[in-house]
Each structure stands twice: as C-alpha cells, then as structure tokens.
C-alpha cells in the first residue's frame, strides 16, 4: 500500500524538489494557505513551509511569525489529532542566523 504524505511548502525549493523526486512512490496531499487542508488519512506529515529569505527587502516581522511559528503550531496540533505516525519538520537557516558573517556549526547559538 502506498504511503500517504501530507506536505506543506510544496511550492518552495525543498518541497518542489522532494515532490519531483518522490511523486511516483507516494500519494501526496498538498497544503496551501488558500485551501487550508487538514490532515485526515495521511501516514506522514512533512512540514517544509517557512519564510527564510526577504528577497524583496520588505522585512515583515508579523509575516515571518505567522508562517514560521503560527503555521508550525497549527500543523503540529493537527498532526497530534490525526492518525499520522511521523512528523518531519525542516527549519531554515533563519532559525540560527540572518547573515553570512561566519560558517554555521552546531555550536552556534540560535539568534533568529
């Protein structure tokens, strides 16, 4: 039986490449902010959604918080209420730092 996967961030870099690589092997339910789907019959939740880059130089704290914190809490809460057994969350480099001053290591204290 094909595993069913609920995925957020399917239009981002990681999500797009993940789907292209695994689309023949799994069944996907794609979460979009417009449809606001809920986890129902999926076995696995992959939470790839997040805002990491401000390419337009229009930094908006509220938007970063909504996407990176509120959405994560909502998705995880829905996961806990679902039959899914696995939750995988990929975070961004923004959770550690927001500049290129030094190389990233495990010893760096997060400073988002």
Cite the ranges covered by each PLM segment.
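Adenosine-cofactor binding site in Rossmann-like domains, unifying the SAM/SAH pocket
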Residues: 23-40, 53
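N-terminal Rossmann NAD(P)H-binding glycine-rich loop of SDR-like oxidoreductase domains
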Residues: 2-24
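Conserved NAD(P)H cofactor-binding loop of Rossmann-fold oxidoreductase domains
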Residues: 48-52, 91-94
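Short alpha-helical oligomerization interface
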Residues: 55-71, 104-112
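Conserved Rossmann-fold NAD(P)-dependent oxidoreductase catalytic core, especially the SDR/UDP-sugar
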Residues: 73-112
């Amino acid at each position: 039986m094909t595993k069913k996967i609920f995925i957020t961030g399917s239009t981002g870099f990681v999500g797009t490449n993940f789907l292209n690589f695994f689309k023949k092997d799994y069944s996907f339910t794609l979460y979009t902010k417009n449809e606001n789907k809920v986890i129902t019959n999926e076995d696995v939740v992959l939470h790839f959604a997040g805002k990491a880059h401000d390419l337009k130089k229009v930094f908006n704290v509220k938007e970063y918080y909504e996407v990176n914190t509120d959405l994560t809490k909502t998705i995880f809460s829905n996961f806990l209420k679902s039959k899914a057994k696995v939750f995988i969350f990929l975070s961004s480099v923004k959770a550690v730092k927001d500049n290129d001053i030094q190389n990233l290591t495990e010893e760096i204290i997060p400073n988002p």
